[in-house]
Regions:
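Hydrophobic transmembrane alpha-helices and their immediate loop junctions
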Residues: 1-247
Length: 247
């Protein structure tokens, strides 16, 4: 990478960081709904500059419906959450206002996001067949990849929370996968996820201290595993199918 390209990329990073920090400072003063709307707008503007307005709007909606899945699932199990907050080039997050009482409850909430994300991908695919819109096909592919990545069984991804209800030892597999992905992509976000997953593994001796949290019946574990493998299967098949259509 030449010196001028380094300067140009650095300048873009500074500008994007400045926009994000200004938006974050403003959102601190806002209520939950206004903070969600403001973070959504900031993310939309940044994504629009990078990828174009139409794709950016579709991408924001994919993130929104993913988080909506978590919100619905949390309501089903009787837990309250914050409104989604959108973070440019990271995604969107919600936070629980109450802690789950066991790993099964946490897994149910975690499943909601990828489940809604999978549905969003299939809806985009249906719209592609209906309208022959390449944008819809690309959004369907994006949704599949995002939710497949999010199902990697490591903390802090949804897959890590789902896998914990099956066996916390699945986190070792997730850390290995994210480590391999980083060495293939050199993506900074993947590096952060890899680091967090390693920290979680390092603290894994606390499993015994809080064993009741992970003490689930075989039926509960198998039910979570069924959802997990089902989502992986549907997303995997859809990803391969859409990739073939994009060729």
């Amino acid at each position: 990478m030449g010196p001028w390209r380094v300067i140009r990329v650095g300048g873009q990073l500074v500008r994007r960081s400045a926009v994000f920090l200004m938006g974050l400072a403003a959102m601190i003063q806002l209520g939950p709904a206004a903070a969600m709307a403001a973070s959504m707008l900031i993310s939309l503007l940044i994504y629009a500059v990078a990828f174009g307005l139409k794709y950016a709007a579709g991408f924001i909606l994919l993130l929104f419906f993913h988080e909506l899945g978590h919100l619905f699932a949390s309501r089903v199990v009787g837990l309250r959450t914050s409104a989604p907050i959108f973070l440019p080039f990271i995604g969107a997050v919600i936070s629980l206002k109450q802690l789950p009482n066991n790993a099964k409850t946490e897994a149910n909430i975690a499943i909601g996001g990828p489940a809604m994300g999978t549905l969003s991908a299939l809806v985009c695919l249906v719209f592609y067949f209906w309208t022959d819109s390449l944008l819809m096909l690309v959004l369907a592919y994006t949704a599949c990849l995002l939710n497949l990545f999010n199902l990697i069984p490591c903390d802090p991804l949804d897959g890590g929370r789902i896998a914990a209800a099956v066996s916390p030892h699945m986190w070792w597999v997730g850390s290995l996968v994210t480590g391999v992905l980083f060495f293939y992509t050199y993506n900074f976000i993947i590096l952060l996820i890899f680091a967090v997953s390693l920290l979680r593994l390092w603290r894994s001796e606390k499993w015994d201290d809080n064993s009741t949290y992970y003490r689930l019946s075989l039926r509960q574990r198998l039910r979570v595993l069924w959802w997990y493998l089902g989502l992986l299967t549907v997303l995997g098949i859809a990803t391969l199918y859409i990739a073939d259509l994009l060729r």
